[in-house]
Amino acid sequence: MGNDISLIALLAFSTLLPFIIASGTCFVKFSIVFVMVRNALGLQQIPSNMTLNGVALLLSMFVMWPIMHDAYVYFEDEDVTFNDISSLSKHVDEGLDGYRDYLIKYSDRELVQFFENAQLKRQYGEETETVKRDKDEIEKPSIFALLPAYALSEIKSAFKIGFYLYLPFVVVDLVVSSVLLALGMMMMSPVTISTPIKLVLFVALDGWTLLSKGLILQYMDIAT
């Protein structure tokens, strides 16, 4: 019986793992920012989606490693087995405390409050008002309330970063368009001229390295 439960748990975890990585880690922010930068440069398929996602995954693994290591050490020290479901549930909940803290830290508090209240309302119905907690009093929100709040928060943050990264490239496009218009070269596509200029500037500034460092530094205190 224990082996059957272990197999079912392993299969369930393997099925959910890609979705957890894609929406429950900083991968969601990294991948969005990288794609937006590529579009801002005027490049369609270079670097390819596979390359960008691979780099985003590697950076995400680097950022999330302290949390994964702490969870691994906890499960190893506690000698968690799959024989007792109640015990397993307790150990999983305690072992994910580090991940829960990470989600709380990088999630919008209003979104956390919204999903937590929605979960309470679904659980208690009309009695929600009597058990509703203020957002400052939420000490240990549910993982199922934190995950959507975190994903939406990271998407919002990624689009903010992408907006600021887009601005200098838009300026280059406008300048090139104005110059071509002043020279009477209205038939020439501004993209033909602006794309090489943006590439030269981006490479000269070592843009990918600066961008990756800036994204990683946002999470450098999660191990503290």
From Swiss-Prot:
Key words of the record: Cell membrane, Membrane, Transmembrane, Transmembrane helix, Virulence
Location(s), subcellular: Cell membrane
Gene Ontology cellular component annotations, sorted alphabetically: plasma membrane
Name of this protein: Surface presentation of antigens protein SpaP
Record's function text: Involved in a secretory pathway responsible for the surface presentation of determinants needed for the entry of Salmonella species into mammalian cells.
Keyword Translocase recorded: no
PROSITE patterns: FLIP_1, FLIP_2
Annotated family: Belongs to the FliP/MopC/SpaP family.
Keyword field contains Membrane: yes
Transmembrane feature ranges: 8-28, 55-75, 161-181, 185-205
GO biological process: bacterial-type flagellum assembly; bacterial-type flagellum-dependent swarming motility; protein secretion
